[in-house]
Amino acid sequence: MQPKRMSHNLTVGEKAGSPFNVILNAANNTNSDNSSNNSDNENDDNQNNNNNNNNNNNNNNEEEEEEDDDDDDDSQQNRHNISIPFTINKNSINNNNNLINNINNNINNMNNNMNNNNNNNNMNNNINNNGNSNISNNNTPKVEKKKTKGKWTSEEDQILIKAVNLHNQKNWKKIAEHFPDRTDVQCHHRYQKVLHPNLVKGAWTKDEDDKVIELVKTYGPKKWSDIALHLKGRMGKQCRERWHNHLNPNIKKEAWSDEEDQIIRDQHAIHGNKWAEIAKFLPGRTDNAIKNHWNSSMKRVSNNNVHLKSHAIEHSLSSQDNQDSPKSIITSSSPIPTTTTTTTTTSTTLITPPPPPLLPPPPSINKKEKKIKQPKKRNASEIEQTLSQPHINQHESSPIVFENISNGNNKIDIPAAQYLMTNGISCINNNNNNNNNNNNNNNNNNNNNNNNNNNNNNNNNINNNNNINNNNNNNNNINNNNNNNNNNNNNNNNNNHSNVSANTNNNNNTINNNVSLQPPSQLNSNIAQLPSTPKNLAHVNIANKLNSPGELMANIVTPIKFFQTATVSMNSSSKNYNNENTNNNNNNNNNHHHHHHNNNNNNNKRPRLDFSSATPTKNNESFSADLCSQFPDILFSPIQNKNNKESFLDNSGLSPLRSPLHTNFFETPMKNYEYLDFNSPKIPNTISPLKNFNSPFNKINNHSNYNNNNNNNNNNNNNNNNNNNNNNNNNNNNNNNNNNNNHNPNHNSHNHNNHNNNHNHNHNEFAQPQPPQGNYQQSPYKNNSTTASSTLSTPSYSNNSSISSSSCSSSSSNSASKATKVIQLSSSGIDKNSLLTINAKLNNNHHKNYLDSSSSSSSSSSSSSSSSSSSSSSSSSSSSAASSSSTPNNQSDLATVPFTPDDNVFNNNNNNNPPTPGKTKFKSRFSPNSKPYSYPQEYDNYGQSSSTPQNINNTYNSICLGTNNNNNSNSSASNSFENNEENNNENDNNGSSSGGDKVPQMDSSFMALKLLKDNPNKSLFSKARKILGLGNISSSSLSPSSFVQQISNSASASSTPTSSSSTPLSSPTTTTSSVAAAIINKISSTPKYFSNQNQNQNNNNNNNNNNISNNSNLSAFSTPGGNDHVPNFESNSFLAQSPFQDILNSQKLDQLHQLTQTNQLSKSKVLLRNHKNSNQTESNSRSTIESINSNGSNNGNNSGSSNSGSNSDKNNGKPISFRLMESSKPIEGL
């Protein structure tokens, strides 16, 4: 008998709890719900397919949507009641307990799978041990998802456009309310990708392709939204698809090979429609190309193969199951009498069971995958294995009883039903896995997006830091501009020299951009060798022998944070940049006046600073990440270096290093607590962390650059040449004193001086106390026994007659020692700032003398240029006298050796010492002092009061300048002072031919005399020996007799013009008489006193003592301005309290002392001129001074008195600065 085909709505009996009814309903509900869920997911997946897999030809968008709509229609058909054909053998259905148990197990599995799938159909199947099956089907109302359509109609498009305009393209949920069967995502995608008015569809043009390639090179192949902003009408998705599918140069465009086809088949059987996963196995092929190749070529072949295989299996199964089928009559008995079971059939057709299809590929988690329409097919062996599984035994109390119709055959043969149940459950399981995997993928995608966002945030933070640094840089540039503008305004007060001042300021503008930007090369090398953790710093210190130039030690307060410095974009390095400045200055010096304005224009160019690499980041190779992890907000931290006093990063206690990029610092960022730094400013430096000891109160010149070794030689040569020209011009001025027509020579002199000033600023600002790139010479410490031969280079002498031997000595000292900012000893004299420091200590007026230092800087060049006219006639005799000197290395000067004085040398048990470094508002742990710096009132009024450097300059010019024109005004005198000040700076810098930095010098004998003014009771020679021993002076000058012999030798040389300095004196008695005669002969009888002028002239003369000839030990008393400017010595201020009293009394010079007590000294000024002859003899010195005195007394009366009387009452009673030069020549016969 043929088997009957039955539909799914066949009810087996009238009982609601019939097992078959439950099974079929469960299967029906399960499949319908599953299909609906799959259809919903499929619809979204299809929409995503439309979004993610657009072809580059956008004309195919609507066609793809139509294809997806067809798939949706097929899925909607699956929502209807599905006919489930199965066959029942009538003979084997009775007494089949295993079948019922198997069905119950399948129901439990279905329940578990349904619960895992989070469906709202709660099926609580409670199977009792007694065999009673209480099955309750609690179908809760399901929240139906909004139905979606496939294809958009033109009416819907019009409604969507109006809704979008109504809601301003923002609230897509409100827009979706206008469509009962559309979601907000569908509305958004439809408008953005199809209906947007700015959307460009169609093929890509050549220009668009080129633009995409260019933008990908700029932004990279990820920032498609940024790339789309540059392509009007194109979206980021379009640009991405265009690049990855067509424009990427790595794409393969060859024909598909058989190997690639086989890889696609194998991977498709594993991954399904995960084209991106399959593309990983095919380099050079995109996922879109693989999908198109699969759908166009390989899918048909695969379908044909599947059809042939399914037909063969169907034939084999039909041959096995082609037996007599039972009738569709099922009888059931029940112990309950009121219950009867009947069998109703809707259709009874005799058919063969359908063959099980082939197994489909494994389920896919990709949303792009389409629903598999064919049910899963199983072969006969799988069905037999499933049916042979153990089942729950039928209980005796079970209400369902089957008759044994099959004559003892307990096996029921319903392969279709078994296939339905097992296949249905497996499909549900697969669907559950698909959904979960999809969710997991979405979460992974979200996590990836979050990671990308975090990375973007990190990048933004780094960029913000760079912007902050750049902003700081801009602010500093503004500050520098303000300073330069202020200086321009001040210099505009000079009449005919505004261009000269402009050139100077322009040079400063160029240098300001290089301030504190390039550390020395040795420091960079040491920084690169430092480890990242502080515990290894000791090893580095041992390796560097604790005295290397760039040695760094960990700070107590904050860790070391290494940073890269900014680079100047105008040139490859700051060294080249400095060389360019030097070349420009050389050219301008050759042209002098004609290219004066061109120099101004060239120096105005500001190099663009690139701070992209200056900002430290934790990913920077020179940035210590583990040290800086605890201090993320600190960019630059203080760095301590207590063992190396020349370090670029000096001792810093609590305040960070000052730089143009940062302003969060305290008063004094650079602390050097072991040195008595008298030149430490009392106010914060506004520009750089390094102090310019040459001019502490010059705001512009307080700069630093560390790479300018090559500029020194060039600048020195230029200065030497310009000195010759300037001296000639000054000689012309001396010859034409009363003529106002001398304007053109003066103007030419101004031009020369201006160029010299440019070089001078470059030298001063670049030659700061920083180690240069060349050979580094570390300054000795207190305990170092360093000799001049081991530490100093041989000074080079010039054959030019206008350059003094003292400038050569200055070159040797400059090349030998670095600027430790302490007082240095020199046989040629005391440095101007060192002299002012000593005077400030003795006079308790430290800041006032600092203000006078700027005016004092001009005396050297003017005196040297004025004296050159008188010294030219005696140059022949000077060479013979210089050759007779017996100094070491046959030189006229002793080498200068830097030293660190003891504290008790300067501290005489008083509290009026100048402040030492280390004092800040907040006491530094390195500072021995407790009081902070005091802010002087004079600095706020700098350049305004009557004691300003300008008035002092006017006074000085009227007195000491060789061009004493009676009709010149104060402004012209100030202009001439400005030029002479520049020349003086040139003379200071002429000696630095060895490439070293300028170091302050100090005359040890003068220091001994000055420091003993306050202590007249102490022994002069013991104190002098202590001070002179610090300068490595020869032992012959330490004895009392030699000390007296030096004084007598100088005095005798001044009193007897015809005598030679090499002639020894017979005895101290004759020396005493010669000293008395020399001094008394130079004393006149005009006891006029002008205290302010006297003090200012005194400072200027002391400043000019750097370049005094060493052959003349004590110059004559003279006054360059005439007899109207003769201060007297008061007994309480000079000899009565000076160490000279001990000397004079010991040599029985009572007459000189008596004249001093009775105010009979007529001339108090010690005029020490800079002689421009390296071999000038003492007789030449005397003739020079006498000629200057004669010229000054005849021609400078009015100009001197016109500027000195305004401040004549301010400095009465102040001690007069006195200068005593020691002789470098050993005295014979003592």
From Swiss-Prot:
Residues 368-378, 749-761 have a biased composition (Basic residues). Residues 352-364 have a biased composition (Pro residues). It is found in: Nucleus. It comes from Dictyostelium discoideum. The gene is mybA. Residues 316-326, 382-397, 515-529, 612-623, 773-782, 942-954, 1173-1188 have a biased composition (Polar residues). This is Myb-like protein A. GO terms for cellular component: nucleus. The lineage of its organism: Eukaryota, Amoebozoa, Evosea, Eumycetozoa, Dictyostelia. Residues 28-60, 115-141, 328-351, 432-514, 576-590, 701-748, 783-814, 853-886, 898-913, 967-978, 1091-1113, 1189-1208 have a biased composition (Low complexity). May control cellular differentiation. Coiled coil: none annotated. GO terms for molecular function: DNA binding; DNA-binding transcription factor activity, RNA polymerase II-specific; RNA polymerase II cis-regulatory region sequence-specific DNA binding. Residues 144-195, 196-251, 252-302 form the HTH myb-type domain. It holds the Pfam family Myb_DNA-binding.
